[in-house]
Amino acid sequence: MTLDLEKADAVAIAAAIRAGEITAKAVVSAALERIAVRNEAFNCFTAVTADTALTDAQKIDQAIAQGENPGSLAGVPFAVKNLFNIAGLTTLAGSKINAENPPATQDATAVARLKQAGAVLVGALNMDEYAYGFVTENSHYGSTRNPHDPTRVAGGSSGGSSAAVAAGLVPLTLGSDTNGSIRVPASLCGIFGLKPTYGRLSRAGAFLFSSSFDHIGPFARSVRDIATTFDSLQGADASDPICTTRPAERSLPQLNKGIEDLRIAVADGYFAKGAEPEALEAVAKVAQALAVTTAVTIPEPHRARAAAYIITASEGANLHFANLRSRPQDFDPATRDRFLAGTMIPANWYIQAQRFRQWYRDRVREIFQNVDIILAPTTPGVAPLLGQEKMVIAGEEVLVRPNLGLFTQPLSFIGLPVLSVPIQRPGALPLGVQIIAAPYNEALILRVAAVLEAQGIVSAPIVQ
């Protein structure tokens, strides 16, 4: 069987490399060639690590020649949002200011763990400055364009990560999610994006935005790739005090268990309003495929979103306060304005937001006593045009940048695990549906996604 390296998923590539059907060097060389030819059209990469990638690929081939198993992701090319430390590169976090920092001396924990699983790093990816945004329109490094329509945004803040997978440049990337920065671009680019439980994966060596909310997670074009990557990334890490010490729970062995024992519901109320019809139709399509007839009401999600904004803006502004005072001109104007607004939030608002967060977490946990999975839209509509400032949602004109996260913020606010799954629509742009579970139940989410994938309801073909 001849492997189409552009279309094959990570699991298939790794299996072919381990079986000796193709070399890791050939796979990585092909990825580097695709990046060289096609990246200019989408502006996904801010750095390409060609030399080290080819060296690492050769080491994988040598290990296989000696009868060793290099890991579940042997020879698979991957790339990461440029807020992850990569040894030898400066960690930009999408900013001009960070470009003055010295190169990182070691890889972020997540990068190191994927390398330990045999994956080969090929570069760093574009993002909104300091991860504050949903569009990846960056005044320093340019806009990342959506492979489905290059006149439109890829989403953000992990836009380079989602577009690189959707365009077939690499099968696997890492991003981060504070308020929706994995799920929004996954939806707009038509791929899978997992935001695990808060604290499940180590963030050590990643440039954080708002520590109360920051998560890391993978993008891929198949459910098994998400599961394999998630499993490779799990594990305690003393370098990140938020990272859990609870044992890893492998999701890949559970992937084909089916969903007969799962109680699944659709989120109504807030999550069934304030969206374009096609976003709600995507949820209905998934619900129908899963024979879901139950609905649940998540209480006060609009307040959760407001509280998430207060905490995010306050923590982000505090982190960057010195530079906001001394060199405001060096920030992306859109980011600077939001951070400056954050400096003016009263401390008692922040305290009230954190108190509400506890109340909200308890109420949502009560819902999960009666259901295992909740379905909701990922974004309120399809990808907006580059430079578009306003969009119409449910007949109302609203700002693009904050409102792309309308349905994601109330969920990351309490650290729930969520997978955005892609609904492809012939002749139209893709949309995502969120599959949501209680903390540490990623394996249940992935089982649901696997059923939908097997039915052909969700899929992530590369954009030709």
Listing of model-derived features with the role each one plays in the protein:
Residues M1-L54, P461-Q464:
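An N-terminal boundary/leader segment
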Residues I13-A19, A79, N98-P102, D214-R221, ...:
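Short, well-ordered beta-strand elements within core beta-sheets of diverse protein domains
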Residues A24-S29, Q58-D61, E276-T297, F321-S326, ...:
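Acyltransferase
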Residues V37, Q116, A167-Y270, A284, ...:
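Structural helix-boundary/capping segments
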Residues L73-I216, G269, A376-E397:
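Short glycine/serine-rich loop/turn segments
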Residues L73-K96, G258-A267, I310-R365, P377, ...:
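Short helix-loop capping/hinge segments that flank enzyme active sites or metal/cofactor-binding pockets
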Residues A31, A53, G75, K81, ...:
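Conserved hydrophobic/aromatic pocket- or pore-lining residues that grip, position, or stack substrates
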Residues N43, D240-A248, L262-R263, D268-Y270, ...:
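Flexible, acidic loop-helix segments that line cofactor/substrate-binding pockets
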